[in-house]
Amino acid sequence: MAAFTCTSSPPISLRSEMMIASSKTVSLSTRQMFSVGGLRTRVSLSSVSKNSRASRLRRGGIICEAQDTATGIPMVNDSTWESLVLKADEPVVVDFWAPWCGPCKMIDPIVNELAQQYTGKIKFFKLNTDDSPATPGKYGVRSIPTIMIFVKGEKKDTIIGAVPKTTLATSIDKFLQ
């Protein structure tokens, strides 16, 4: 997994907010996003006393988060599961995820890379566990992200959590013919 560093000093546009005049409490709702090596950095200010906010900004109130999950990998749901996954001629990798899941967002770029790398050899699908809860329940998905590999309709392997690309690739390679 790629390492990244977030800068701890606030952007110039926010430094001026540290010098807010006179009032004890200031109500601001500011959110700015900055790109840091493929990740988004969020600076967020809310209703706090000016001393507290200035102190937080001096400490570097910057939070790093992974990008929203939006991919070219086709979606599968409870109603399309059988036709797309169980009846597929080639091996299938299914990424069980949810939009609110931080680790799912972290592993998303890795799954996308692997989908491109294995194009024509293996099919990749994503299943949103919030929108389609029956299928994850049937396969015992209790934690996300969970990645399952199916061969001829049979579950062959399960990988739980945000794991490195090499771990996923090794698991996938076992089922290629």
UniProtKB/Swiss-Prot annotation:
Active site: 101 (nucleophile), 104 (nucleophile)
Site residues, Deprotonates C-terminal active site Cys: 95
Principal cellular location given in the protein's record: plastid
Key words of the record: Chloroplast, Disulfide bond, Electron transport, Plastid, Redox-active center, Transit peptide, Transport
Subunit structure: Forms a complex with heterodimeric ferredoxin-thioredoxin reductase (FTR) and ferredoxin.
Transit peptide start and end: 1-64
GO cellular component: chloroplast
Residues of the site described as Contributes to redox potential value: 102-103
Annotated CDD domains: TRX_family (cd02947)
Function summary: Participates in various redox reactions through the reversible oxidation of the active center dithiol to a disulfide. The M form is known to activate NADP-malate dehydrogenase.
Subcellular compartments: Plastid, Chloroplast
SUPFAM superfamilies: Thioredoxin-like (SSF52833)
Any one GO molecular function term: enzyme activator activity
Record-stated family: Belongs to the thioredoxin family. Plant M-type subfamily.
SS bond list: 101-104
Pfam families found in the cross-reference section: Thioredoxin (PF00085)
Protein name: Thioredoxin M-type, chloroplastic
PANTHER family found in the cross-reference section: GEO12009P1, THIOREDOXIN DOMAIN-CONTAINING PROTEIN
InterPro entries the record matches: Thioredoxin, Thioredoxin-like_sf, Thioredoxin_CS, Thioredoxin_domain
Domain Thioredoxin: 65-177
